[in-house]
Design a protein with these regions (language model features):
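A short beta-strand element within beta-rich, extracytoplasmic domains
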Residues: 538-562
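Beta-strand-rich ligand-recognition modules
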Residues: 557-559, 563-640
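Active-site neighborhood of glycoside hydrolase catalytic domains
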Residues: 246-323, 327-336
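Feature activates predominantly on carbohydrate-active enzymes
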Residues: 93-279, 386-388, 595-597, 619
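Accessory carbohydrate-binding/adhesion or oligomerization-edge regions at the termini
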Residues: 438-525, 551-553, 584, 618-647
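Flexible, acidic glycine-rich loops studded with aromatic residues
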Residues: 328-464
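Short beta-strands within extracellular/lumenal beta-sheet-rich domains
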Residues: 522-536, 604-608
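Acidic, contiguous N-terminal accessory segments
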Residues: 20-140, 311-312, 435-442, 449, ...
Length: 647
């Protein structure tokens, strides 16, 4: 590895991030944006010109933006003007969510076909740089590639407070996501008050977060909160699966005649209690169908109540009128002749992703192998499924990259495009794809600093971590076997298998049949090594994220043994010194869905302190693997590592 070149690239990255202005850091980046070199001076305030048809919510949002930058609102019409107008046509825009945003010497001019577009234009304006009450001149034409841009919250398994939900809704709105998929019924609990059957939400009927549920008033408050932010509230009543809480209370199977009667009562009460809701997800997945008439009958009943229905695919026997939410299988195209409507959620479960991998895979995603909305595909839903219990709700935001994932997904689904297939690691640094990701990473890191300083945001800059992968060495099934490279890691006589960039490197993905790792034809009973060098201006101890088998938050995975990083005998050496694994709180604990993770993942424990010397520091990661089967399906073999400075 060329030390001078590495250091030069590192300096370039640091310089470019520090000099990236908010003006260039819009997320999602608009479809068409043209900057001018000049600026508009707002130090003397602005005059407002607002159409009477503009909603009060948008007017208040505009006032909040101006007040946030201490820009006064003036009655004098001779100064700069900010105008909000709904127009019948707009060049380059054919979506109600699209907009035109122009800043010139006369002021700020926003036009849209509907109030949604005004709202999204203001979200773009909110991210503009108003330093010293000056803003750059720009001309924007923007609209989404997909009209359905969703985020799923699973509060059935792990309850979240109203304030926590509103925090996430606010982030959704700021990044132009427009559907909240609200999963509130589960095996562990039914979390919505029923006036007809109040015992359904009793503490004794819940196996986790006992008694925690949403009252009718709170549920309505969520609906209203979403509506005010142009977010469709999509509740899910999962039927007939994930219904153990229902069955504990009613003492019948949901698919039985009596069970159907009870669920219809609840559905009728739901429709009468929340008459403004017109969309309902009816579930249908992960259940043995004993009554083939259940789903057709329930679907027709739900539709008779005035709802458009959504269901999981694969799942039960859905009706043709039900929108299919795809969640299993590889990156396949939709059959254009199927005559059905789809949403994509395949490999969009962040609970199965490493935090750094989350941003990587979502940035490059092409939804259902399409670059934009089609007649059969209206969009996608990013899902957060914390199946495993958590000690406190905040843990969900550190164990999974909720906010980094949300805004990366928002970028991709608004802009469209992406690349065919799925990836878990970064492309080569000479490629255009890498440079596109690096540019986005600069934007997301600026947003982390500017907008998420007080919120959990498990992401670190990874485009400056350069690795040589060396191997494979045949370990003959002995994962502790040592090879010469451990004594002389930076000798010139080793064959470099591949140069790889990234903070998390997945050698072989545990879903290798659909997601490639960085090793093209991985072999069992192999050992690879990853080597790198890191510069330090002085001798000091610095924090690092170090990890190996990133445990899914949906499996009952076992905790590593004391003294081991993982079950593969992976090791880390810095300047020839072995870095010990953390002292685990629950070493060797057999996994269980009711046993919360505590420190097993690098993103939700204290960073590992590593002693660095002045100058270049040698990093060597040992990565042995035996077979690829894993102990069982709860403990798949995860041949991977994370090593990255923590800032």
């Amino acid at each position: 590895m060329n030390r001078i070149a590495h250091f030069f690239l590192l300096l370039i990255n640091l310089f470019s991030v520090s000099n990236l202005s908010s003006q260039e850091a819009l997320i999602p980046m608009p479809q068409d944006i043209q900057w001018s070199g000049n600026k508009l001076d707002l130090s003397k305030g602005m005059h407002l010109e607002i159409d009477k048809s503009i909603r009060k919510n948008e007017v208040n949002l505009l006032r909040d933006i101006l007040e946030g930058h201490s820009i006064n609102i003036q009655k004098d019409k001779r100064g700069p003007t900010i105008s909000l107008k709904i127009v019948s046509s707009l060049n380059g825009v054919d979506s109600e969510e699209g907009y035109g945003l122009k800043i010139d010497a006369k002021g700020i001019h926003i036009q849209a076909l509907a109030s949604k577009g005004i709202f999204y234009a203001l979200q773009t304006l909110r991210q503009m740089d108003f330093h010293e009450k000056q803003v750059a001149l720009v001309n924007i034409r923007d609209q989404p590639a997909y009209s359905f841009r969703g985020f799923l919250l699973d509060v059935g398994r792990n309850y979240q407070s109203l304030s926590m939900l509103k925090e996430q809704i606010d982030v959704m709105a700021k990044y132009k996501l427009n559907v909240l998929h609200f999963h509130f019924t589960e095996d562990v609990a039914w979390r919505l008050e029923s006036k007809k059957y109040p015992g359904l939400t009793a503490a004794e009927n819940m196996t986790r977060w006992a008694g925690e549920h949403y009252s009718v008033a709170e549920f309505q408050e969520l609906i209203d909160y979403c509506r005010d932010r142009h977010i469709l509230f999509l509740p899910e009543i999962d039927m007939p699966g994930h219904s153990a809480a229902f069955e504990r209370f009613f003492k019948v199977n949901m698919q039985s005649e009596e069970g159907i009667g009870h669920i219809k009562e609840l559905l009728k009460e739901f429709s009468e209690t929340y008459p403004t809701l017109k969309h309902l997800h009816i579930g249908g997945d992960e259940v043995k169908i004993s009554n083939k008439q259940f789903m057709p009958e329930i679907t027709k009943y739900v539709e008779s109540l005035g709802f458009k229905t959504y269901g999981w695919d694969p799942g039960s026997n859905l009706e043709s009128t039900t929108v299919r939410q795809m969640w299993m299988g590889g990156p396949n195209s939709i059959d254009p002749n199927a005559g059905l409507q789809y949403l994509d959620s395949k490999h969009l479960y962040i609970n199965h992703m490493d935090p750094l991998e989350t941003v990587t895979t979502l940035f490059f995603r092409r939804f259902a192998e399409q670059e934009k909305e089609s007649e059969r595909l209206s969009g996608a839903i990013l899902c957060s499924w914390p199946d495993r219990a958590v000690e406190k709700p905040e843990d969900m935001f550190l164990q999974s990259a909720v906010y980094p994932g949300m805004i990366t997904f928002a970028e991709r689904i608004w802009r469209g495009g992406g690349e065919s297939g799925w990836r878990a690691s970064l492309p080569g640094r000479e490629t255009e794809a890498f440079h596109e990701f690096a540019a986005f990473e600069k934007r997301i890191l600026l947003h982390k600093t500017k907008y998420f300083a007080d919120l959990p945001f498990p992401y670190q800059r990874q485009t400056e971590m350069f690795w040589d992968l060396i191997g494979p060495y045949d370990n003959a099934g002995d994962l502790t076997k040592e090879f010469l490279i451990e004594k002389d890691p930076f000798g010139d006589h080793y064959h470099v298998y591949k140069n790889q960039v990234g903070g998390t490197i997945i050698l072989r993905h545990w879903w290798a049949d659909i997601i490639p790792g960085v090793i093209e034809s991985p072999k069992q009973n192999s050992t690879f090594y990853a080597r790198s060098r890191i510069w330090s201006d002085k001798t000091e101890e610095k924090p690092f994220w170090i990890g190996f088998a990133n445990l899914s938050r949906s499996y009952a995975s076992d905790s590593p043994a004391q003294g081991a990083w993982d079950e593969l005998h992976s090791q880390v050496f810095v300047n020839g010194q072995k870095i010990p694994a953390p002292k685990w709180k629950h070493p060797g604990q057999k996994g269980g869905l009711e046993l919360p993770l505590s420190d097993e993942g690098y993103s939700f424990r204290e960073p590992t302190k590593v002693q660095l010397k002045e100058g270049w520091n040698d990093i060597l990661i040992k990565l042995p693997v035996g077979d690829f089967k894993g102990k069982d399906w709860q403990n798949p073999t995860k041949w991977m590592f994370t090593f990255i400075p923590y800032h």
